[in-house]
């Protein structure tokens, strides 16, 4: 009996020694970002964000510092240059015109993350960084939708293919704090279903409501088809639009993509429409105007370097565009160079 007992104890000790020790990932600190510059052939541009300067021009330098611990981390995303200045325009006291994103997050578990701070919007297909966009110029929907939010959000992974995000935020693009004491908070939500996203925000000083769909499908290994549709209403006017983004990859280094966008401005001012009897925007249109744009972009990649030649044509419902004189059409050619790190 004694020998049997000793054997059992030895076996238990062996099992304890051989039991795998759960490893905890070490915290990581990373610096990434990009630099971009471009040449634009036309002195005049459509009324969209970024890539709208004449001749040889610079985009921005983007430096993103991030720290990821076992349960928590932060992101500090800084931008320098014209593209960055256009993206961060809600710095009311001028103390943070360089801050594109600045937030801290905490993972309660593998499925639930809380984020507090300033973060880029979850609406729309396009983003501020030129690295993540296929087209170098931007759409009207992106240009007049929100760029960023300051608030708190909860990201919930319901299953591997279904996710939910809920947020309470300041007035849209108010980077530092809620500067308008009369403004209500903005509430946001996102439902993710198998890689397709339905986005929603509502509230703020102008009682804005925006519903947005962003998605895409891999038609084949080389052919991707992206889709974005949005509807925005507010006391200051409305707009809506839809865009498709077919992209074909010919090789590891070259791809070709198209953006076709149809955009309607109803008294919002993006296309020079009237609001409450007064002219708003750059042109002098009616209370409702339309614009369609066709953008063809090539993308050549070599390591971290990206070269993008791009042709864009805008066609308006009336002469609210400007090309030396009022016109209803505008075309331009852009060559962009981007380096990511």
Model feature map: region roles:
Residues 104, 110-121, 150-158, 198-210, ...:
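Hydrophobic transmembrane alpha-helix bundles
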Residues 54-59, 95-100, 146-150, 183-187, ...:
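Residues that define the transmembrane beta-barrel architecture of outer-membrane proteins
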Residues 6-114, 154-164, 218, 227, ...:
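Beta-barrel outer-membrane channel/assembly domains of diderm bacteria
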């Amino acid at each position: 009996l004694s020998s049997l007992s000793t054997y059992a104890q030895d076996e238990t000790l062996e099992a304890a020694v051989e039991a795998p020790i759960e490893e905890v990932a070490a915290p990581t600190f990373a610096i990434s970002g990009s630099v971009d510059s471009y040449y634009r052939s036309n002195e005049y541009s459509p009324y969209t964000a970024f890539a709208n300067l004449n001749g040889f021009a610079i985009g921005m330098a983007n430096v993103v510092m991030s720290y990821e611990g076992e349960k928590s981390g932060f992101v500090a995303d800084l931008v320098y240059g014209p593209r960055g200045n256009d993206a961060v325009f809600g710095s009311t006291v001028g103390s943070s015109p360089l801050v594109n994103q600045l937030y801290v997050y905490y993972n309660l578990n593998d499925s639930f993350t809380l984020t507090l701070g300033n973060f880029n919007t979850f609406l729309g297909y396009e983003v501020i960084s030129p690295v993540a966009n296929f087209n170098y110029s931007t759409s009207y929907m992106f240009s007049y939708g929100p760029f960023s939010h300051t608030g708190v959000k909860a990201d919930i992974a319901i299953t591997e293919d279904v996710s939910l995000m809920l947020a309470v935020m300041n007035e849209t693009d108010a980077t530092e704090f809620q500067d308008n004491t009369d403004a209500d908070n903005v509430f946001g939500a996102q439902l993710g279903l198998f890689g397709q996203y339905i986005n929603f925000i509502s509230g703020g000083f102008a009682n804005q409501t925006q519903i947005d769909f962003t998605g895409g499908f891999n038609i084949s290994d080389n052919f991707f088809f992206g889709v974005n549709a949005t509807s925005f209403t507010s006391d200051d006017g409305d707009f809506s639009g839809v865009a498709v983004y077919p992209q074909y990859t010919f090789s590891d280094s070259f791809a070709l993509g198209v953006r076709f966008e149809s955009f309607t401005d109803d008294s919002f001012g993006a296309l020079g429409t009237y609001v409450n009897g007064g002219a708003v925007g750059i042109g002098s249109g009616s209370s409702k105007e339309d614009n369609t744009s066709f953008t063809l972009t090539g993308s050549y990649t070599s390591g971290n370097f990206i070269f993008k030649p791009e042709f864009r044509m805008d066609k308006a419902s009336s002469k609210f565009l400007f090309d030396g004189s009022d016109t209803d059409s505008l075309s331009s050619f852009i060559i962009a160079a981007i380096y990511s790190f």
